[in-house]
Amino acid sequence: MIDREQVRKVALLARLELTPEEEEQFTTQLGSILDYVEQLNELDVSNVPPTARAIDVSNITREDNLQPYADREAILSSAPEQEGEFFKVPKILNAE
C-alpha cells in the first residue's frame, strides 16, 4: 500500500502542488492501482508467449499512389498562402 508521504514525494518529483484533499484522493487511487498490479503479478503467465501487440498485425498501410484531382485550383485557392502550384506553410524548423 502507498502512503501519503510517498504521494507527496511523487508530487514533488512531478513538480505538482497538491492540497491535503488531493493527497488523500491520490493515496487511495494509487493504492487501488498498485493492488490491482499486485493481483496481475500473481497470474501464471509461464505458458503465454511474449508479444509486442495484442493482435498480429503487419503492414496495414496502403500504397501511396498519386491521383490527379480535377479541380486543383479550387483546392489551392482555399489555402491562406500559395506559391505556384504548392501550399505555402510557415517555417517551423530552425525558425530562430
Curated annotation (Swiss-Prot):
InterPro entries: Asp/Glu-ADT_sf_sub_c, GatC. It is an enzyme of class 6 (ligase). Keywords: ATP-binding, Ligase, Nucleotide-binding, Protein biosynthesis. GO terms for biological process: glutaminyl-tRNAGln biosynthesis via transamidation; regulation of translational fidelity; translation. SUPFAM superfamilies: Glu-tRNAGln amidotransferase C subunit. Its EC number is 6.3.5.-. Pfam families: GatC. One of its GO terms (molecular function) is ATP binding. It catalyses: L-glutamyl-tRNA(Gln) + L-glutamine + ATP + H2O = L-glutaminyl-tRNA(Gln) + L-glutamate + ADP + phosphate + H(+); L-aspartyl-tRNA(Asn) + L-glutamine + ATP + H2O = L-asparaginyl-tRNA(Asn) + L-glutamate + ADP + phosphate + 2 H(+). HAMAP family: GatC. Heterotrimer of A, B and C subunits. Belongs to the GatC family. Allows the formation of correctly charged Asn-tRNA(Asn) or Gln-tRNA(Gln) through the transamidation of misacylated Asp-tRNA(Asn) or Glu-tRNA(Gln) in organisms which lack either or both of asparaginyl-tRNA or glutaminyl-tRNA synthetases. The reaction takes place in the presence of glutamine and ATP through an activated phospho-Asp-tRNA(Asn) or phospho-Glu-tRNA(Gln). This is Glutamyl-tRNA(Gln) amidotransferase subunit C. It comes from Nostoc sp. (strain PCC 7120 / SAG 25.82 / UTEX 2576). The lineage of its organism: Bacteria, Bacillati, Cyanobacteriota, Cyanophyceae, Nostocales.
